A protein has these predicted regions:
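Low-complexity, intrinsically disordered P/S/T-rich segments
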Residues: 1-198
Length: 198
């Protein structure tokens, strides 16, 4: 009977797991002879307030802008942009124009009932109609306005000297202040590297 019981027993549905060998790589925690030789013996520490920054005259002076966009040209572009939007069935009025070093921001206040997604979807058509490489369209947070950024024909060079010489830089309290450039409105932009996630 025991032979019949063995024949009637069904084979297991799951094959037994085979024990695999796990090979971990060795961590490179040990220092080699070269690393010991080149290790810094000590860190020179300056007394607080004893370090002086290099003078600003080591950096190039900002050149006078050869071409400044006139208020008339900005007004004409704003009217042209309103006409382009009207051609696509978008009613609204441009309230503010903010020329920056690289792009100019046109703030459009859409008429009642105009969806912002409709205007945002027209960004490629706006760029083509305004003879621009690209147009960036986004809602201005906290206001009933849509920002339309169009690139300037002549980009303004931003010099490190004018950023480091700005009053805003002197007023920063960061330990590692970085000069990033200028905002769309032409104001200097700084950030504290010590406060950034890392």
């Amino acid at each position: 009977d025991s032979d019949d019981a063995e024949e009637d027993a069904e084979p297991p549905l799951v094959a037994p797991l085979k024990k695999r060998q796990i090979i971990r790589r060795k961590s490179a925690n040990g220092k080699g002879a070269r690393e010991h030789r080149e290790a810094q013996a000590e860190l020179p520490v300056f007394e607080p307030g004893s370090y002086e920054f290099p003078p600003l005259n080591l950096l190039a002076k900002p050149q006078a802008r050869a071409r400044v966009v006139s208020d008339d040209a900005l007004e004409q572009n704003a009217r042209m942009l309103e006409n382009v939007l009207a051609d696509f069935g978008v009613k609204g009025e441009i309230q503010n124009v903010r020329p920056g070093p690289v792009v100019t921001l046109y703030e459009l206040e859409p008429a009642a009932g105009v969806k912002s997604s409709r205007i945002i979807g027209l960004s490629d058509d706006i760029a083509r109609s305004m003879s621009a490489v690209a147009a960036r369209v986004a809602v201005v947070p906290g206001r009933n306005a849509i920002g339309i950024e169009l690139p300037n024909h002549d980009r303004e060079m931003v010099y490190l000297r004018e950023l480091l010489g700005a009053e805003e830089y002197e007023g920063t309290r960061g330990d590692l202040t970085l000069a990033l450039g200028k905002s769309i409105g032409g104001e200097p932009v700084f950030a504290d590297l010590a406060r950034m996630p890392h």
